[in-house]
Amino acid sequence: MKKDVVAGIGEIGKPILKLLSKQNITVGFDLKPDLMNQRIFEKYKNLKTSFLHIAIPATSRFSKNVLKLSKKFQPECIVIHSTIKPGTTAELQAKLSIPVIYSATRGV
């Protein structure tokens, strides 16, 4: 059994977390602990991570933050939902041995 992790539970991450939770074991992670469901996070913390969904702000430290999150959760694959500059996915892919996927966020 594995879990998915959504990093960044804001405008983008919260709906992704809600949707994925319907079919998969999914936990949210955020620097603001009050946004996280600590009970769920603790319950599944020892499960391996299948997908790490990135929904954090694209600051100048974005790549470094993604690498830290990858080290923390050790996922099999990373999916970036944040709006990022061209070349960021390739830059991260060159530094990681797992697939890195960019999934553009689209409004309705």
Language-model segments: which ranges?
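NAD(P)+-binding Rossmann beta1-loop-alpha1 motif at the extreme N-terminus of oxidoreductases
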Residues: 1-44, 51
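Structural motif
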Residues: 9, 30-31, 55-58, 81-83
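Glycine-rich, highly charged phosphate/nucleotide-binding loops
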Residues: 36-45, 57-69
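Rossmann-like NAD(P)(H) cofactor-binding subdomain of soluble oxidoreductases
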Residues: 51, 60-108
